[in-house]
């Protein structure tokens, strides 16, 4: 259920809030973000949507889910630009928040204090299972946090982790199912362990 009822235009006072949708890759974060933003538009609220310029996997400008559902957005280089471009709106949506700078936390706080409903989606952990970008800070200040899960491709259980199947130590590497797989804790540990080699003892 959404944190805030969307069709609240009858209220004379705008009530700001911060909603965070987080989880692993392929967990439906963007899909849930799009659902909430579409409902806000149906309620005749003014909506502005942003994504980092680095995210060009499906489209250079639109926010696109893995299911290929899309909504028009504005790509921005840094979080400060979101403040500059968010005047006179009721709802601000932000996708792939993990790729933004740490200033996004303060940007979200300022927007909510101004009465804007801020809906944010992003990876909470990187491929090493470490906190990713500004997501920990955003979860800390959020009025609501929705943790969504993918399905583990190895065993079918709920998956919380994004396992990288290609070589590379850099934290940011855009990819799809060929490069990343959603895994549960047990399967992540199994896939992360170095392969066991049989010890061969020579006999005389």
Curated annotation (Swiss-Prot):
InterPro entries, A to Z: P-loop_NTPase (IPR027417), Thymidine_kinase (IPR001267)
Amino-acid positions noted as binding ATP in the UniProt annotation, renumbered to this chain: 23-30, 95-98
A Pfam family the protein falls into: TK
Protein EC: 2.7.1.21
Catalytic reaction equation(s): thymidine + ATP = dTMP + ADP + H(+)
Record-listed Zn(2+) binding positions: 152, 155, 184, 187
Keywords, ordered alphabetically: ATP-binding, Cytoplasm, DNA synthesis, Kinase, Metal-binding, Nucleotide-binding, Transferase, Zinc
Entry GO MF terms: ATP binding; thymidine kinase activity; zinc ion binding
Main location: cytoplasm
Superkingdom assignment: Bacteria
Gene Ontology annotations of biological process type: DNA biosynthetic process; thymidine metabolic process
Residues passing through the membrane, by range: none
Active site annotation, chain numbering: 96
Cellular-component GO terms for this entry: cytosol
Presence of keyword Membrane: no
Location relative to the cell: Cytoplasm
Family: Belongs to the thymidine kinase family.
Subunit organization: Homotetramer.
Protein's recorded name: Thymidine kinase
């Amino acid at each position: 259920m959404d944190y805030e009822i969307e069709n609240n235009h009858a209220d004379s006072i705008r009530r700001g809030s911060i909603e965070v949708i987080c989880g692993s890759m392929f967990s439906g974060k963007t899909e849930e973000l799009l659902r909430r933003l579409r409902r806000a538009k149906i309620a005749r609220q003014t909506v502005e949507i942003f994504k980092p310029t680095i995210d060009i996997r499906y489209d250079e400008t639109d926010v696109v889910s893995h299911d290929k559902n899309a909504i028009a957005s504005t790509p921005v280089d840094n979080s400060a630009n979101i403040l500059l471009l968010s005047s006179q709106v009721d709802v601000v949506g932000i996708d792939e928040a993990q790729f933004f700078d740490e200033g996004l936390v303060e940007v979200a706080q300022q927007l909510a204090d101004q009465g804007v409903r801020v809906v944010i989606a992003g990876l909470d952990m990187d491929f090493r299972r470490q906190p990713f970008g500004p997501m920990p800070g955003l979860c800390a200040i959020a009025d609501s946090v929705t943790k969504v899960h993918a399905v583990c491709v190895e065993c079918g259980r709920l998956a919380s982790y994004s396992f990288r199947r290609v070589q590379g130590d850099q934290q940011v590497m855009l990819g799809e199912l060929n490069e990343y797989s959603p895994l549960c804790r047990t399967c992540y540990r199994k896939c992360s362990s170095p392969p066991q080699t049989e010890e061969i003892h020579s006999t005389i």
